[in-house]
Amino acid sequence: MPIITDVYAREVLDSRGNPTVEVEVLTESGAFGRALVPSGASTGEHEAVELRDGDKSRYLGKGVTKAVENVNEIIAPEIIEGEFSVLDQVSIDKMMIALDGTPNKGKLGANAILGVSIAVARAAADLLGQPLYKYLGGFNGKQLPVPMMNIVNGGSHSDAPIAFQEFMILPVGATTFKESLRWGTEIFHNLKSILSQRGLETAVGDEGGFAPKFEGTEDAVETIIQAIEAAGYKPGEEVFLGFDCASSEFYENGVYDYSKFEGEHGAKRTAAEQVDYLEQLVDKYPIITIEDGMDENDWDGWKQLTERIGDRVQLVGDDLFVTNTEILAKGIENGIGNSILIKVNQIGTLTETFDAIEMAQKAGYTAVVSHRSGETEDTTIADIAVATNAGQIKTGSLSRTDRIAKYNQLLRIEDELFETAKYDGIKSFYNLDK
């Protein structure tokens, strides 16, 4: 039977050693689902609330026992007494949103609500004997995503003196996901060798990318291009580059202040100068995607950037849109950006996540399914990427098990789909003039 008989949450640890929420759901028939909730380092101010305890004597205030209690003492009784079917995802998600009663899930916590939402979906898939991607996407979920591999970490994700948070490679010239993963791995290892030869650090950051002390942004870019060529691939044809600028992390009082991360030599740019700078980088290097190139509240700057390079570069809103359909709708109406980053914990339920992806795709925006810097062994985002035919996934570098787990899950899915599996490569950037 599909009726849920037990919902249980516990406090576990994420990839940074910080507490997070794990939720388990059980049905009458024994179907079971488990979910672990991720956590971000650089967060948009409009994100749903991640509930932390604030007790400095325990986990430095980062405990999640309040969120766990909210699952076990508030959400679980509501689901069990209401005799909800595990197959009724939308009703359960809406019930939790109503039970919270705040616009940002600040009462129960998005980390509590999301854990239940994903665990319910996993239990439903188990009940039906289906893989999660097939339960979520039906027979039409068959497109494997282009991986956006974050091989150099800067900004808030590392101690490297570079303002931009992520430098990514995208193997769009591959013909299968399996091949794209191999290309990325070969480039990653070539990059490590090049860094070692230069006497630079090869320790990795939160998302598995290297965090050496480059001599600035262009040094990082040119070193990555060198690694692509050393691996035997053609930059700008087979492999493109991408940035996550995370501009909100160094924007203050109308100024993009690179010195926050780059020290006394870091530039200070107005919005117009920031647009000019990003355009110069796009003109000089094979860049296909830029995330959060402008501050989340600098909508005039976003408009300028979109008008300037939005026809040839994917401009992804992360802190800008925070997986929120109300904000995304405003962005679509005003021609802001051309893509949305999808992070399940920014909004807090699977239902709202799927609504955001659908809205973006209907408007001709791309949707990039993404991890967080604080991750776990949970692989749900891999299944979501295939279920929604998103075409792109951002889940870190080619090291750290919390990142590799998602890539390995995509390899399994590609194998399961066999001849029906698609990898569209450059065609996944369907709204660009490429």
From Swiss-Prot:
Gene name tied to this protein: eno
UniProt: phosphoenolpyruvate binding residues: A41, K343, R372, S373, K394
InterPro entries in alphabetical order: Enolase (IPR000941), Enolase-like_C_sf (IPR036849), Enolase-like_N (IPR029017), Enolase_C (IPR020810), Enolase_CS (IPR020809), Enolase_N (IPR020811)
UniProt pathway: Carbohydrate degradation; glycolysis; pyruvate from D-glyceraldehyde 3-phosphate: step 4/5
Cofactor(s) demanded: Mg(2+)
Assembly and interaction partners: Homodimer and homooctamer; the homodimer is inactive.
MF terms in GO: magnesium ion binding; phosphopyruvate hydratase activity
Residues the entry annotates as binding (2R)-2-phosphoglycerate: Q165, K343, R372, S373, K394
Main subcellular location: cytoplasm
Binding site for Mg(2+): D244, E291, D318
Domain of life: Bacteria
Catalytic activity of the protein: (2R)-2-phosphoglycerate = phosphoenolpyruvate + H2O
Name assigned to this protein: Enolase
Keyword list, A-Z: Cytoplasm, Glycolysis, Lyase, Magnesium, Metal-binding, Secreted, Virulence
Disulfide bonds: none
Effect of G138A: No longer forms homooctamers
The species this protein was found in: Staphylococcus aureus
EC number of the protein: 4.2.1.11
Annotated family: Belongs to the enolase family.
Location of the protein in the cell: Cytoplasm; Secreted; Cell surface
Residues forming the catalytic site: E207, K343
